[in-house]
Amino acid sequence: MNEIAFLDLNEISLQSLSPMLSMMVFALFILIVGAIKKDLSRNFYCVFCIIAIFVNLGITLDFNGLSLSFWDMLLVDGISIISQIIILIASALFIPLALSTKEYFEYKIYEYYALFLFMIAGFLFMVSSNNLLIIFLGLEISSLCLYTLIALHNKAKSVEAAIKYFAMGSLSAGFFAMAIAMFYLATNSIDIARIGVAIKDLSLNQNLIILLGCVFIASAIGFKLSLIPFHTWIPDVYEGSNAPLAGYMSIVPKVAGFIVALRIFAMLEGSGISWIKDMLYIIAVLTMSLANIMALVQKDVKRMLAFSSIAHAGVVLCALVANSHEANVALFFYWIMFLFANLGAFSMLWVARCDDVVCWDKRFKHPYEKFSGLIKILPSYAVIMGIFMIALAGIPPFSVFWGKMVLISSLIKSDYVVLSLIIMINSAIAIYYYLKLIVFMFLKEPIVKDKNIYISNVSMALKVIVGVAVAGTVFAFLFSGAILEFIEHFVFASGF
């Protein structure tokens, strides 16, 4: 007779679950309160979301040491803590953008804010597990919320974008589920560490099922990180989303996705599957190069920023190619530096949101011509947007430059000199399309003379967020050393 297996409830460990549980409790509270009292303003929901995020941040910072719980499915280590901090801070910076002067449909309904918190909980699950099933659960929670948030913009293009994202996301989920099945079939485990041990001990690195699992999981991750050739959904989805959500999508989901990729690809390389590194090398080069080339020919600034985010993802992927301690530190540092500049760029697009007067190409919301001669109409806007463009181009002394410098330094230490040169060449290409917007703002004649059209969506909340983004972008060199030490401590503690 088979022995009956008993589950030890002490393994649940509410402390490990507390970041995700608390976020879901806050989201449920919004749903209950919103259903009972329907006249609450978006100010209440935004402030409540920020409080929820900072409570969660406090819980995260309270962790001390490695913790493996929930029947070995939840992992709290340095990698998960630092990624949770980035996700929570980025979320806290983006949610106030809902407090624009114009009241858009999605920001007037309480479901938006509940879905936003549920989405964050999904990202936290993704980065806090070494178990493929829990990662898949977090991936689907966050993705389903994100599809809905995009559609809530209540525009034809938004619904189209949500459907496209849903279709691509469903394909990605299918690939991920197939990968889980393949790995379980070959190793009898869905735990990343145990899969790696089984592949190494049983010499399964040439096993057909394992190879298929690697292909499926690489494809799923490629979709989520918008790596070439899995990038085609990005420009249309960004264009159909409102600017704050597009900016959020360019950072937080990718941070969560890169943590999953870091854990999985490090395991596969360590278990003797050497071709993974070569595959990542090729994809990184293609993603950087082709995305930059496609960004050159864009006529809409938001679409340009979409391809720009793909190119930056290709740059960060180089850290996974090196797979060294320094490169892993550079991965986190790069996303923090990129956060400020990209937050600022998309915030400025949200400031310039104006549907009332259209005197440019009606196919696009943010064509380059919209910003023509802005230095003569609204000098402060032109200067601030110029700072963000220069920063994204990787020009010193602004934030992204320091991220690239640390990453390139780690690649050179790992003897990836050619890859470092490719990053530099692509950075030079990117300068063109970032400076193109600056040329329109500073050297072209204005099309619209009324500055109120450009600032009709401005609010105090937007000014504060833009101010934070400017400060983080311009003064990054002052705190970059402290951030690097902070990241290095957590990455070292995780053994990466």
Swiss-Prot record:
Cellular component annotations (GO), alphabetically ordered = plasma membrane
* Reactions listed under catalytic activity: a quinone + NADH + 5 H(+)(in) = a quinol + NAD(+) + 4 H(+)(out)
Lineage: superkingdom: Bacteria
Say which enzyme class the record assigns: translocase
Residue spans crossing the bilayer? 16-36, 46-66, 79-99, 116-136, 166-186, 208-228, 245-267, 278-298, 304-324, 331-351, 382-402, 422-442, 464-484
Tell me the Pfam families matching this sequence.
Proton_antipo_M (PF00361)
| Keywords, sorted A to Z | Cell inner membrane, Cell membrane, Membrane, NAD, Quinone, Translocase, Transmembrane, Transmembrane helix, Transport, Ubiquinone
User: What EC number(s) does the entry state?
Assistant: 7.1.1.-
- Give the matching InterPro entries: NADH-Q_OxRdtase_suN/2, ND/Mrp_TM
| Compartments, record wording | Cell inner membrane
Q: From the UniProt record, which GO molecular function terms apply? A: NADH dehydrogenase (ubiquinone) activity; NADH:ubiquinone reductase (non-electrogenic) activity; quinone binding
Q: Does this entry carry the keyword Cell inner membrane?
A: yes
Q: How does it sit in the membrane?
A: Multi-pass membrane protein
Per the annotation, which location comes first and is thus the protein's main one? membrane
Q: Which GO BP terms apply? A: ATP synthesis coupled electron transport
Q: How does it assemble?
A: NDH-1 is composed of 14 different subunits. Subunits NuoA, H, J, K, L, M, N constitute the membrane sector of the complex.
UniProt function note: NDH-1 shuttles electrons from NADH, via FMN and iron-sulfur (Fe-S) centers, to quinones in the respiratory chain. The immediate electron acceptor for the enzyme in this species is believed to be ubiquinone. Couples the redox reaction to proton translocation (for every two electrons transferred, four hydrogen ions are translocated across the cytoplasmic membrane), and thus conserves the redox energy in a proton gradient.
Per the record, the similarity remark reads: Belongs to the complex I subunit 2 family.
> Mind telling me what this protein is named?
NADH-quinone oxidoreductase subunit N
